[in-house]
C-alpha cells in the first residue's frame, strides 16, 4: 500500500519526542489526536497576522476574519456533503452539539409520554443529555441492546419503536469497541417510522468519508480535536428545515436580529441563532486546516491504510494468551482489551514507562462496561500516523507486563 506514512509522521512534531526515555508511541488518538504542523501554523498565523473579532466589524481585519470563518463553514459543509453551509453550526465539541439538540429540538418538540431510543454502546455525551431531558419532560428512554460481539442487530430496532417514539440517537463508530454501525440502514428504518435521527460521528469522520445526505440523518455531530484539529471546536450539522424551526438554546450577542427592552428580542436565522457570543475563531481556522490536511491525503487512502494496520494489530494482539479483546473483528480506530486479571490502570501505567500512550478506564461508556461486566478496559487507538512498529512496541510491552505480573 503506497500510503506516505513517513511524510505523514514528519508532519506531526509531537511524535518526535521521547517519554520516559523512550520514543513515543501515541495510541490515544480516539481521546484526542495529535496536530499536524499545518494546523499549528494556521492558528499561529491567525493570532499573529489576522486576529480580530468577527461579525459586524467594518474594519479590514474584522471583515477578513469573518470571511475566513464563513469560508470554513462552507468547507465543513463540503467535507460532510451537507446541502448548504447554513446547515453547519460551530460549537465547542460533540458534547455541546448533542446538548444543543436535546435542549433546543428536544424541549421544543418532545413532551411527556414520548420516547426516544439510544444504544448500549453510546458515549456518555449521547446518554446524559437525553437522561436530563427525560427527567425534566417525562420522556421515556429506550435502550437498543448489543449482541455478544458488540454490534447492533438491525432487526431489533423495530421492537423499540411505537407511536410514542420520536427520536433515535446513535453513534456511527463506538469509541470503545470500534464497531462501525450500518448507519444508512439504521437511519432508513428509523425514518420510515417517522423518527428524527441524530448520529454521533465523533469517532467516524477521521476514519472514513461521510455524506450526511446519503446517510439521511437529521443531525450529525463531531469534534475538531479528534480530526487532527484544535480543541474547543466542533460541528453540529442539522437539516435546514429542522434548524429553522428550533429555538435558540443560549442567548447573547451575534444570535439576534433586534433587541428591545419593551418589545423583546427577535433572533437571527439558523445557523447564527445557535452561535451566541464570540466564537472560537482561531479554532475554526485550525479546523479548516485539519480538513484540508485529511482531504489532501484522501479519506479513502486513509481508511485503507488504517484498516490494514488494524488487521495487523488484531492478529498480533490475539497471540497474547492472557489478553481479552472486546468488540467485532471488523472495526475502525480502536482496540479495547484487558490483560489477564490485571487492572487496566496498572497495564496503562506500565506501558507509559515504555513510552506507550494508551487510554484506560471506563472511556465515558459505563453502560458498556456493565454489559461486559468489567470496571474498566485498556484502549489502544490507531490513527493515520501510526505504524506496524507502533503495534509491535505495544505487543512487546504487553508481553513484558505479562511476564512481570504473571
UniProtKB/Swiss-Prot annotation:
InterPro entries xref list: Aminotrans_V_dom, Aminotrans_V_PyrdxlP_BS, Cys_dSase_SufS, PyrdxlP-dep_Trfase, PyrdxlP-dep_Trfase_major, PyrdxlP-dep_Trfase_small
Cellular component annotations (GO), alphabetically ordered: cytoplasm
Record-level Gene Ontology MF annotations: cysteine desulfurase activity; pyridoxal phosphate binding; selenocysteine lyase activity
Keyword presence, Cytoplasm: yes
Superkingdom, taxonomy of origin: Bacteria
Keyword Lyase: yes
Coiled coil: none
A GO biological process held by the record: cysteine metabolic process
Localization per record: Cytoplasm
Biochemical pathway: Cofactor biosynthesis; iron-sulfur cluster biosynthesis
Gene3D superfamilies found in the cross-reference section: Aspartate Aminotransferase, domain 1 (3.90.1150.10), Type I PLP-dependent aspartate aminotransferase-like (Major domain) (3.40.640.10)
The protein's required cofactors: pyridoxal 5'-phosphate
Record key words, sorted: Cytoplasm, Lyase, Pyridoxal phosphate, Transferase
Membrane-spanning parts: none
Pfam families named in the record: Aminotran_5 (PF00266)
Catalytic activity entry: (sulfur carrier)-H + L-cysteine = (sulfur carrier)-SH + L-alanine; L-selenocysteine + AH2 = hydrogenselenide + L-alanine + A + H(+)
Chief location: cytoplasm
The EC number(s) this enzyme carries: 2.8.1.7, 4.4.1.16
Active site: 364 (cysteine persulfide intermediate)
N6-(pyridoxal phosphate)lysine PTM positions: 226
Function: Cysteine desulfurases mobilize the sulfur from L-cysteine to yield L-alanine, an essential step in sulfur metabolism for biosynthesis of a variety of sulfur-containing biomolecules. Component of the suf operon, which is activated and required under specific conditions such as oxidative stress and iron limitation. Acts as a potent selenocysteine lyase in vitro, that mobilizes selenium from L-selenocysteine. Selenocysteine lyase activity is however unsure in vivo.
Quaternary organization: Homodimer. Interacts with SufE and the SufBCD complex composed of SufB, SufC and SufD. The interaction with SufE is required to mediate the direct transfer of the sulfur atom from the S-sulfanylcysteine.
Similarity remark: Belongs to the class-V pyridoxal-phosphate-dependent aminotransferase family. Csd subfamily.
Designated name of the protein: Cysteine desulfurase
Amino acid at each position: 500500500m503506497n500510503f506516505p506514512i513517513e511524510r505523514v509522521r514528519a508532519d506531526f512534531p509531537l511524535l518526535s519526542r521521547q517519554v520516559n526515555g523512550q520514543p513515543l508511541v501515541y495510541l490515544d488518538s480516539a481521546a484526542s489526536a495529535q496536530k499536524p504542523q499545518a494546523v499549528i501554523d494556521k492558528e499561529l498565523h491567525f493570532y499573529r497576522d489576522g486576529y480580530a473579532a468577527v461579525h459586524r466589524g467594518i474594519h479590514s481585519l474584522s471583515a477578513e476574519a469573518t470571511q475566513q470563518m464563513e469560508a470554513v463553514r462552507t468547507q465543513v459543509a463540503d467535507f460532510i456533503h451537507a446541502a448548504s453551509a447554513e446547515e453547519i453550526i460551530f460549537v465547542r465539541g460533540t458534547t455541546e452539539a448533542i446538548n444543543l439538540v436535546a435542549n433546543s429540538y428536544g424541549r421544543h418538540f418532545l413532551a411527556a409520554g414520548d420516547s426516544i431510543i439510544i444504544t448500549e454502546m453510546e458515549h456518555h455525551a449521547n446518554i446524559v443529555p437525553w437522561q436530563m431531558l427525560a427527567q425534566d419532560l417525562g420522556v421515556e428512554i429506550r435502550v437498543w441492546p448489543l449482541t455478544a460481539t458488540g454490534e447492533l442487530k438491525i432487526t431489533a430496532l423495530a421492537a423499540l419503536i411505537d407511536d410514542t417514539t420520536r427520536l433515535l440517537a446513535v453513534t456511527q463508530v463506538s469509541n470503545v469497541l470500534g464497531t462501525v454501525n450500518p448507519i444508512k440502514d439504521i437511519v432508513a428504518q428509523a425514518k420510515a417510522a417517522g423518527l428524527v435521527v441524530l448520529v454521533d460521528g465523533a469517532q467516524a469522520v477521521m476514519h472514513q468519508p461521510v455524506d450526511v445526505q446519503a446517510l439521511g440523518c437529521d443531525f450529525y455531530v463531531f469534534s475538531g480535536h479528534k480530526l487532527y484539529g484544535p480543541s474547543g471546536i466542533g460541528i453540529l450539522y442539522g437539516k435546514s428545515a429542522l434548524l429553522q424551526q428550533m429555538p435558540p438554546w443560549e442567548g447573547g450577542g451575534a444570535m439576534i436580529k433586534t433587541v428591545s427592552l419593551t418589545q423583546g428580542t427577535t433572533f437571527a436565522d439558523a445557523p447564527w441563532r445557535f452561535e451566541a457570543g464570540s466564537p472560537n475563531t482561531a479554532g475554526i481556522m485550525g479546523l479548516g486546516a485539519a480538513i484540508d490536511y485529511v482531504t489532501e491525503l484522501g479519506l479513502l487512502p486513509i481508511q485503507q491504510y488504517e484498516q490494514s494496520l488494524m488487521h495487523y494489530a488484531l492478529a498480533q494482539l490475539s497471540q497474547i494468551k492472557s489478553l481479552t479483546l472486546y468488540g467485532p473483528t471488523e472495526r475502525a480506530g480502536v482496540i479495547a482489551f484487558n490483560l489477564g486479571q490485571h487492572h487496566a490502570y496498572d497495564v496503562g501505567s506500565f506501558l507509559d514507562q515504555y513510552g506507550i500512550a494508551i487510554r484506560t478506564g471506563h472511556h465515558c461508556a459505563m453502560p458498556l462496561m456493565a454489559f461486559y461486566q468489567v470496571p474498566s478496559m485498556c484502549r489502544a487507538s490507531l490513527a493515520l500516523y501510526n505504524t506496524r512498529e507502533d503495534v509491535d512496541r505495544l505487543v512487546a510491552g504487553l508481553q513484558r507486563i505479562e511476564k512481570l505480573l504473571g
